[in-house]
């Protein structure tokens, strides 16, 4: 099962470059019997468009050839912790034992492992960091944010 994490899109619903890199990675990994779970709802920092981020992600993957039958319900999340919580709720409705391939961005993998490892404890997971292809300065800003977020989690734990 492929779980592709959401990221910012534009007010128009157009997906941003980080989302596209994650979705292209998902498409590259997709096989005929795969299931796909798209995450991302709405939030002031990543999606203020009419539809959920997951809606736009699914539409993108369908345009690239992923069939409707491959998609699970959306995890309409607000952040990475919420991605894991809502993913767990969806997985609880399915047959146990599937390998989860969690797709995020290269700079985000460490925090995703920390969060999903706690919330989805007991699931077999593989983590893929899609190459973000960002300018060095933008990449460094995101990496700095991730380091601070990880330190906060390690110091205070997760709240969910």
Task: Please name every model-derived segment.
Residues 143-160:
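A polyampholytic, Gly/Pro-enriched intrinsically disordered region
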